[in-house]
């Protein structure tokens, strides 16, 4: 009797493992390569994110692939529903610019279970399995440090204006700058940085207005984006503390930043290479359309330093 009970227990355990094996993660499979390329973007954008959507759409349709996209309008719950529908519609692949890195996770996991590859870009997703095509944000800070290291005077004093430090891009830009400037120019001192920022020009004005009252010497300003860098320049001008020897560096290569470089005020910015991001995403989609599951994890896209010396290539 004991032997029969033991055999029944083994059979029950085997059944449990077989059932478990029937579901679960199919993220290494491509269940429907003939389906549509689906693109979920967090909000309408005329900048780099809008370019990503428009270029992937144009190239996908140019390749003869069906293409669908959804715009969440800043609503994380709506985006969750949109991506879930893409899973239900059996898309070939889903490209996501997430409104919220936590809220979107259940839909990413559903896509994994359905064998639909997920490609994330620009914004973090905090769970599930996906390929993450992102700028090398750490390199952005390193490029700023490279420029400052080459142009700052001995024993220079600099300040750093952080972006939203809940976002990994802001953290990596700051860490890249801090470590690179220390390694390249140990004589340079970062005398101040804010705890977090909102990426706005007003933030740059506020921080520099405060620091100008505290520090008689500020030789350089590195900012996590161009808007804050331009705000810093405005604050320094208003205080009568801006001149050609002050080095201000930004990130994003927005039109106002390029104009400021042309005017000799902003010394450099860092360009997110949208064309390279699109090229990388299209390469992954080509794999998927051929039935091949792409490599998971981060795919880092290099950034580009823009100064007066190469400005004409990017205006």
Label every model-predicted segment:
Residues 6-14:
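Sec-dependent N-terminal signal peptides
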Residues 2-5, 22-315:
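A residue-level marker of the well-folded mature domains of exported/periplasmic proteins
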């Amino acid at each position: 009797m004991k032997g029969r009970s033991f055999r029944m227990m083994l059979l029950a355990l085997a059944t449990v493992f077989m059932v478990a094996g029937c579901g679960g993660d199919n993220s290494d499979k491509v269940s429907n390569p003939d389906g549509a390329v689906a693109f979920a973007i967090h909000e309408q954008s005329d900048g780099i994110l809008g370019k990503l959507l428009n270029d992937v759409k144009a190239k996908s349709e140019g390749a003869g692939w069906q293409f669908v996209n959804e715009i969440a309008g800043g609503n994380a719950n709506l985006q969750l529903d949109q991506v879930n529908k893409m899973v239900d519609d059996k898309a070939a692949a889903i490209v996501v610019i997430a409104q919220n890195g936590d809220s979107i996770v259940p839909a990413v996991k559903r896509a994994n279970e359905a064998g639909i590859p997920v490609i994330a870009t620009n914004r973090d997703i905090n769970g599930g399995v996906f390929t993450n095509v992102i700028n090398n944000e750490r390199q952005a800070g390193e490029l700023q440090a490279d420029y400052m290291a080459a142009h700052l005077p001995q024993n220079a004093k600099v300040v750093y204006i952080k972006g939203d430090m809940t976002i990994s891009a802001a953290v990596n830009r700051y860490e890249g700058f801090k470590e690179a400037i220390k390694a390249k120019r140990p004589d340079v001192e970062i005398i101040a940085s804010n705890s977090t920022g909102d990426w706005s020009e007003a933030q740059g004005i506020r921080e520099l207005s405060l620091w100008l009252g505290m520090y008689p010497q500020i030789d350089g300003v590195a900012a996590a984006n161009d808007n804050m860098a331009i705000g810093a320049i405005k604050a320094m001008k208003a205080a009568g503390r801006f001149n050609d020897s002050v080095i201000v560096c930004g990130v994003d290569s927005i039109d106002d930043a390029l104009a400021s470089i042309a005017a000799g005020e902003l010394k450099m910015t860092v360009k997110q290479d949208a064309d390279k991001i699109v090229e990388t995403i299209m390469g992954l989609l080509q794999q998927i359309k051929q039935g091949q599951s792409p490599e998971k994890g981060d795919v880092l896209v290099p950034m580009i330093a823009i100064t007066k010396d190469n400005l004409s290539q990017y205006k």
